[in-house]
Amino acid sequence: MLVKFKISNFLSFNQEQTFSMISGKVRSKQDHLISYKKQKILKFAAIFGANASGKSNLVKAMDFAAVTILRGLPINIMDNYCRTSELNRDKPTKFEFEIKIDDRYYQYGFSLLLYKGQILEEWLYDVTTPSTKTIFERTVSDEPIVLSKQFSGEARKTLKIYAEGMQSNESLLYLTEMNRNKKDLYTKYPVLKPLRDVYRWFRGKFVVNYPEDPMSPAYFVD
């Protein structure tokens, strides 16, 4: 389930903006909410606004992020930064999702320079409890990947090997790489399950539809 989505420096979005499915303080319509621990999440939401106010661009931002996660950076993206200021050309664009999978909450995101088609950073956290737990943090440079302390032994060594093999790859996300023909990896090391679960959520649960797209009954099947 999508809980939050944050976007900055993309199309009409300049400063960071947040789309949140967390309920406000209104106590009516409790049947429209999903309760988990102390949090109440909306089952559905609608976005209202004038023409050219950014509604479609929010959907495009979600779609762009999902495509990048599942397939790699799209082509012809150099002008997709927010062009209200020419300075934005050299500023990072940031996408971040907070999602709920079973009884866990994850925060996954990445930043990139659209003008150069260059991924800069990537991160995945477990935010189920108030104490955020790092699963991994990646900076596309010479810096080594930061991994959770729960990964040890051969599992940790394997993660580092894959990270080192793509450390300078500026067009591919680590989460994507860790889900390319690696089914046996998660059977051998179940502790790595969060990397598989988050990717599978984007592949199987996160569906972006545009107004002109035909609606399939399959979209309504959980």
PLM regions: where:
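Short, hydrophobic/aromatic-rich segments at coil-to-beta transitions
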Residues: 1-5, 88-97, 118-120
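Pre-Walker A-like glycine/lysine-rich segment at the N-terminus of P-loop NTPase domains
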Residues: 1-64
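Short acidic, glycine-rich loop/turn motifs
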Residues: 7, 97-103, 124-126
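Glycine-centered tight beta-turn/hairpin loop motif at sheet-sheet or coil-to-beta transitions
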Residues: 12, 101-105, 129
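A general secondary-structure signal for short beta-strands and their flanking turns/coil
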Residues: 14, 42, 90-94, 105, ...
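Post-Walker A helix-loop "phosphate-sensing" segment adjacent to the P-loop in P-loop NTPases
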Residues: 64-77
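Extracytoplasmic beta-strand-rich oligomerization domains located immediately C-terminal to a leader/signal peptide
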Residues: 77-109
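Electropositive, glycine-dotted interaction segments
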Residues: 107-222
